[in-house]
Every structure is written in C-alpha cells, then in structure tokens.
Amino acid sequence: MVLKRKIYDKLLEWKENSQGKKAIMVEGARRIGKSTIVEEFAKKEYESYIIIDFAKKDKNVEEFFNLYLNRLDDLFMMLGTYFGVKLIPRKSAIIFDEVQSFPQARAAIKYLVADGRYDYIETGYLISIKENIQDIVIPSEERSINMYPLDFEEFAWALGEEQLIDYIKNCFEKREALERGMHNKAMHLFKQYILVGGMPKPVSLFVESGKDFTGVDAEKRDILKLYRNDIMKIKAQYRSKVLAIYDQIPGLLSQHEKRVVFKTIQEGSYAEQYSETFFWLSDSMISNECFLCSDPNVGLSMYEDRGYVKCYMGDTGLLLSHAFDENELLESEIYRQILNDKLSLNEGMLYENVIAQMLVANGHKLYFYTHYSEEKHRNDIEIDFIISNNSKLKYKMFPIEVKSGKRYTTNSLTRFKGKYKARIGEAYIIHPRNLLIKEDILCIPPYMTICL
C-alpha cells in the first residue's frame, strides 16, 4: 500500500515554487520510503518520468553520463530510449534514486537544471560523508529536505483515524482535555505506534493484516540487519566506535540520565574521539542526537556542548526490536501483552525515544539541560528536551519533561522555570494522562506532541 506522507506536500511546494530552477534532494534513512513517495509524486504530477536507481550500478546508464554530459540532447535521447519513456519539456521529471551511489550524477545537477527542460528529484542516504562527496562539487541548484519515519499523525492516517487527529489538534488549541473514551482510544493508538514504529513496511503489514503484529517484528529485524551491514562497510578506523554506540543505544536509554558516558565504552575515551561516529549516525539518520545546552536561550545552538550527548533511535519500533536479542523473534502475543500493560518493560526508554522522534519529525533540533547542585551533590534540574522554534512565540524557548508514569513531581521543571523565567514561552510535561494545567505547566498526553 502507498501511505499518505506529509512530505508529498513539500514536494508539491517545491515543484510550484522552483519551476525547474532547482532540483530537490530527499534525504532519509534506508527503508524510510523515499523511492516510493518520489515515484508516486512523479506518477501523479507529471505526464512522464524516468527513475534511475543508481544502487543497481547499471554500467550502461553510468556510461551515458560519462559520455554525453556535454551533449544533453544526446543524453536525454539515450535515457528516454533506454528506459522506454518519452520525455516532454517542462512536463517530465527525472528521478536520481540512491544518488550517493553515483556522485557524478549529483554533480551533473548544476548543468541539468541550467538546461531547464525537466525537473529533477534526487533521493539519498549518507550523502554527506566524505566517501560520497570527495570528488564532486555539491550543486547550489539543489534544495534538500529530510524524510523521517511516519510520525504519529501519519500512522493514524494509515489506520483511517483522520478525525481523531483533527479532534486532538482542536483540543490542544483550546487547551481542553479529550473526552475520556477518546483519550483512551488515542492512547491505545499511540501505544500501537510505539510498538510498530513508523517504518513504512512494518506499518503497511500492520494495517493490511488488520492490526496483527505477526510479521511486523520480522520486518523490523530485517531493517536492523540492513543497518548493521551498512555499519560494517564503514572505514575500519571508526567502524568499531559506530557499532559500539549503535549496540548500546537501548542500554543507554534504559539508564536514568540516558546520556552517553564515553569512558564506559572504552576506558580512557572521550567525546572528541567520537565526532566522526556521531556524524555518521546522524547522516545515516539511524539515530537522533540530543546535545546539552549549557545556557538555555533562544539561540540554543550557540550554547551546544557536544561533550554531552543522548543518542536516540531514529524509529521507536526499531528500538523495541533492537532492545531484545537480535536472534529472538518477538511473537505477536508478546506485543499484545506489552500493548495491554501485562508485560513489564522500560516504558521510560520508549516514551522518551518516541517523543524525540516526533520532535525531530516536526523540524526541531534536540537539546537537553542539566544543572548540578554543589550543595546537594547531584543534579537538581534535568530537562529532557528544549525546543525554540515555535511559530507563535518564536523568540522563546519551551522546556519539555517526559513522564512515562501517571505519578510524578514537577520539581525539576519548576526550578528551571524559576531560573530562566524571562526566556520561557511555555513549559510542557508529556505524560500518559489527559491534558491538564498544573502549576502553570501544560501537561499533555504523548499523542499531542504532534502539536509542538
């Protein structure tokens, strides 16, 4: 099934605004659905299109670019003939799928866009690492957009719950709690989202099977194996570090502080030694990094301390499968026990990861904050996330605490508010209960994160 994705509207906006003057690059992790959505877009929005999958390493196609880039009439004739597609000026699109596999095609975008006859859509993965850009000039005629796993809203669409999403958004705008039955329904749907995740194939299997978890876990494990295989192809000098961080993500997130303690990975190691590691993980979009903001203000990035980092899995459904033994396939019944709260597991790990995933999908860069009290000899403030680019109050920051249980204190967030009162637009606690306002803090259920 072809899933409805928000990125489709971004592609439409690009097509209407660029009028052939810029190509668009869709970046995203493997198996995120890049190829599917761009081909669906080309099919609906153009009279004809060619999709070139450079991962197939077709020597004939590569030779066309090597021989005819200076003779574009010949290049287009060869491509049209080879793929059996009639290209129509200003009414056809050419898709460069997995363009990182043939960087010369990406470099050619400069000349192809200048020619102006066709629109160009690229998809890429790991497009910024040195191996994929060292011999080319990255074209300025290229606009880049990120594609993520399905967010909760897209997951709800896939299950036919558009009206529920509209109701959730309406309640958030009015600062009203959902009707109890609707809240329970939304929480049940959200738990399904945590377990299945947002990777298109597992979601499609879940929907098509009538919400059966059979096959979902196996599909997720196939994706995890693909990620591990990609890591094993990295240059030897930092392969082991990437693998160490990747393997430790579930363990790190199950701890109280959740941040990476580098000396526990290898004795005597420190953050600077892992800069390439996190660059690879970030560029692959396998994980979402959250850095310490040492002095929370509107310009959060100005006070970013990369020596302190939390590393979340890019997809929470994958995190769940990754947290169990790789060779131990989770039966559908296990998923149902988790869904119905009959099997105990670290919900805090999953909740914080899924909130990170949803914030990133909304365009936020992730930051956290801690304050160590010399008097108490411990952290007396711990803020899980801070965001700043809210459209209504864009010059303020918004601290977020994530609570997986229904009973909790607000001490940490209250202290943070007292310390940085003038800089804060609104403070949020994300909890499993319905919407309520507590001590001037807006407490919202996790599904309302789509509104932040």
Label every model-predicted segment:
Residues 2-18:
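Pre-Walker A adenine-sensing motif
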Residues 56-89:
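Short glycine-rich substrate-engagement loop in P-loop NTPases that contacts/grips substrate
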Residues 95, 119-125, 146, 155:
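Structural recognition of the conserved hydrophobic beta-strand(s) that form the central parallel beta-sheet
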Residues 111, 128-144, 156-161:
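Short regulatory helix/loop adjacent to the ATP-binding pocket of P-loop NTPases
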